[in-house]
Amino acid sequence: MPSTPTEALLDVNVIIASVFADHVQHVAARSFVEGLERFHTTPMTQGGFLRFATRPWKNERKEEQPPRLTMAEAQAKLREFTAADGHVFQPDDVPFTEMGLRSMQGHRQWTDAYLLHLARKHGLALASLEDRMANLDDPAKPALFEVV
């Protein structure tokens, strides 16, 4: 297992878990982010957080529930999260056309592969709660770090 990085690009699931106290991984994600010297978010991950926070969801009985937050509340939560010491806004500055496709196996991997590509370009680890992203990682490049 790689050592804990001092700087990382956060996948949207780490942002969600860090912000929502009722998330099953909240404590681990929050602790990880607070332990970093710098944490990066992108337009893609910020938009993913806003989309998650403002969409209807289903409870354990599959009943439709209203969104967790209003649009304004979600934007305020994101603003609060990104106002923390150590936050760096990382532009999406790598074209999808420059990505290697060696490890990709399906259409659902585009975003994950892009975030790994962006992290590599900037010498960052990518923090995620999803171990499936490890399948896209290239051992010759900066390691994917998972919050578990």
PLM feature segments, named:
Residues 1-41, 56-73:
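Short, well-structured N-terminal submotif of metal-dependent ribonuclease cores
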Residues 2-3, 83-131:
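Active-site neighborhoods of divalent-metal-dependent phosphate/nucleic-acid chemistry enzymes
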Residues 47-50:
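Amphipathic alpha-helical repeat scaffolds of TPR domains
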Residues 54-57, 83:
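A basic- and aromatic-enriched beta-loop-alpha substructure that forms the phosphate/nucleotide-
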Residues 76-80:
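Acidic, glycine-rich loop-and-strand cores that form catalytic or ligand-binding grooves
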Residues 107, 141-148:
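Short, electropositive alpha-helical surface patch
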Residues 133-140:
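Short loop/helix-cap segments at secondary-structure boundaries that form the rim of catalytic
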